[in-house]
Regions:
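Polytopic alpha-helical membrane-helix bundles and their juxtamembrane interface segments
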Residues: 1-119
């Protein structure tokens, strides 16, 4: 299995699953999840800043993580149970987007099409 396929599976199963779980559960999350989301947001922020510097040709992927995903995770993690519902719904949408985007390219790596080959 290629590295790209593993990254896609990671985002489909773990990232998509986590985001959907947090988005649906909202304020009923176990209390330990909020600091976990905060730390995860910081790690994602730092990792994708590093990646945008060493691989600038794919910087747009890193910018999505830097400017959308990590601030959302940090905000939810910091505010905890006081987080407004709209931020959980944004995370829920990000979970579905991750599953859809990475699922599309995972299937495309198995059954190539013109769209997935131009990646």
């Amino acid at each position: 299995m290629s590295k790209e396929s593993l990254v896609q599976l990671f985002h489909i199963i773990l990232v998509g699953g986590l985001f959907i779980y947090v988005g649906i559960t909202r304020n009923d999350l176990p209390k330990f999840m909020y600091p976990t989301l905060l730390v995860l947001g910081i790690i994602i922020f730092l990792y994708h800043i590093y990646k945008s510097i060493i691989k600038p040709q794919r910087a747009w992927i890193n910018y999505i993580h830097i400017f959308l995903i990590s601030p959302l995770l940090v905000y939810i993690g910091y505010n905890g149970q006081d987080t407004p519902r709209k931020f959980f719904e944004l995370l829920l949408m990000a979970g579905f987007a991750a599953i859809g985007y990475h699922g599309f390219y995972l299937v495309g790596s198995i059954y190539p099409t013109k769209i997935t080959e131009d990646k």
